[in-house]
């Protein structure tokens, strides 16, 4: 999770204001911290290996998968569960993105979130979760697992530019993609699909387009 439970934080503040600090839920801190998403999965399935959470906003799930890939690659584990979840449709979540002017103001459902369109004006908030099982290749083959895909490269970089805007030249994101391709030993022309961030905001889509062009030529 990138933000933990905003709802728990809201409920805690409301309880402080209406009934005093002594009436706050004693579990409010575990509910708020981001690593509880991974912790609850660990408890549910009895997984007792490495259990961490990366909190990097919209890149959280991808970075968690990348870290799980590295854990297997380094020999720390044979199997890892990795993914992300977010549930931030609540007053503070909506208000925060509204103040950022990141949410679409369109009343037309077909035009409310239109990434890379010249008339884009923001995104529509959603909630969801997704988890993948990563497994060392020989371990998966030996037990007859149904292998759906193989992770062969991973790149992660920082723009060191601004707290809400990507680097204007797309250099940071481009280098992450180039690093992943180098590790995978694939050429740009071999890539058939790019899963873009595509927030439908003016700056993100513009700078992300530049990043893709830099990485793929």
Give names to the regions the model predicted.
Residues 1-56, 85-94, 188-206:
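Conserved beta-ketoacyl condensing-enzyme motif
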Residues 3-21, 71-74, 94-107, 168-169, ...:
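A glycine- and small-aliphatic-rich helix-loop capping segment at beta-alpha/alpha-beta transitions
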Residues 26, 30-34, 38, 61-65, ...:
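Generic structural signal for well-ordered, non-membrane alpha-helical segments
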Residues 34-86, 124-145:
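Active-site-proximal alpha-helical scaffold in enzymes
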Residues 41, 61, 68, 97, ...:
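Conserved small-residue
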Residues 64, 176-184, 211, 215:
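Stable alpha-helical structural segments in soluble proteins, enriched in small hydrophobic residues
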Residues 78-121, 154-168, 196-205:
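Acyl-CoA/ACP chain-elongation machinery
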Residues 108-186, 190-193:
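Condensing-enzyme catalytic core mediating Claisen C-C bond formation in acyl metabolism
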């Amino acid at each position: 999770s990138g933000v933990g439970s905003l709802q728990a934080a809201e409920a805690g503040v409301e309880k402080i204001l209406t009934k005093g600090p002594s009436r706050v839920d004693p579990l409010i801190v575990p509910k708020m911290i981001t690593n509880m998403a991974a912790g609850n999965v660990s408890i549910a399935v009895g997984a007792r290996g490495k259990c961490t959470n990366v909190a990097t906003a919209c890149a959280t799930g991808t970075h968690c998968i990348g870290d799980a890939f590295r854990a297997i690659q380094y020999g720390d584990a044979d199997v890892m569960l990795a993914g992300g979840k977010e549930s931030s449709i609540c007053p503070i979540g909506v208000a925060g993105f509204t103040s950022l002017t990141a949410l679409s103001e369109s009343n037309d459902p077909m035009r409310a979130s239109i990434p890379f369109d010249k008339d884009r004006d923001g995104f529509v908030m959603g909630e969801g979760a997704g988890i993948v099982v990563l497994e060392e290749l020989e371990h998966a083959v030996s037990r007859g697992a149904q292998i759906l895909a193989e992770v062969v490269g991973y790149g992660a970089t920082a723009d060191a530019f601004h707290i809400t805007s990507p680097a204007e030249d797309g250099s940071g994101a481009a280098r992450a993609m180039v690093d992943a391709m180098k590790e995978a030993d694939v050429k740009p022309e071999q890539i058939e699909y790019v899963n873009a961030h595509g927030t439908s905001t003016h700056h993100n889509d513009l700078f992300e387009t530049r990043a893709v062009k830099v990485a793929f030529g």
